[in-house]
Amino acid sequence: MSNQLNAALSGQAPTALAEDVSLATPLTAPRITGRDAVSAALGTYQQALAAPEATVSLKGDEVEGVVYSASPGGRETEIVALARNNAAGLIATIDVYGRPWPFMAALREVIAKTDPALADPSLGSGPYTPDGPTPVWVDHPAVPPLAQDVTLYSPILREEPTGNAVVGPVLKAAAQSFSDLKVRAVLDIEGQPGFAVVIDEYVEGGHVQQLVEIFTLNGAGEVGGIRIFTRPWLVTAQFRESMYALLKDTLGPEFWEGPESEDPLPTP
């Protein structure tokens, strides 16, 4: 990951952005356009996350990305930002996804105090579909077997399911919650074995839920960890409701704590 990319994604290097750059955020549905507006929005996220740490770098043929981790209010929150450059080498598009949903809810409250428009979850009229030109879809890479001690860092759960016997049923339930998926890009993880997949999933109500799934591999080549980030806010909220209906008898209440679930998100 270049220092310039990190600075641009933090809202600190607006000259690295194209004049017509556009940004998709984890919380809002429509894209934000224009260098000044995008740089300001990125700066608001940087401030709300309280100086997040870049923990993982991703690299693909036409897109690169960074995973950021932070603990605003003592709640570990992660976002992944993907950037594409134009022919002049300036950043043309940025897409940001977040996890986990209960802690993104708390982050949304913080952002709303600074810029209410950045926290507006409205999907508009009709099913949500991403803005922009239709991408060139690619094949989903083969996924190795899950390790016995695999951990799932879910986009919707407060806690992390661990172990093949638990993670397997969660992934099976997720597969029942969408009707189709298409792959936008596949990226390598810099410095460690694994890969990331950028996906559009067609979920209940005809909405598109956008995801980044990061698979890290252990020494045996098995999947040791899966990190899943999603956007936009309301589509993920609806997906969470579908998953709760399927898994409420499998996963205990500690997994579901958060807004509009059985228990409120605890105050740190």
Please place each PLM-identified region on the residue numbering:
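C-terminal and inter-domain tail/linker signature
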Residues: 1-268
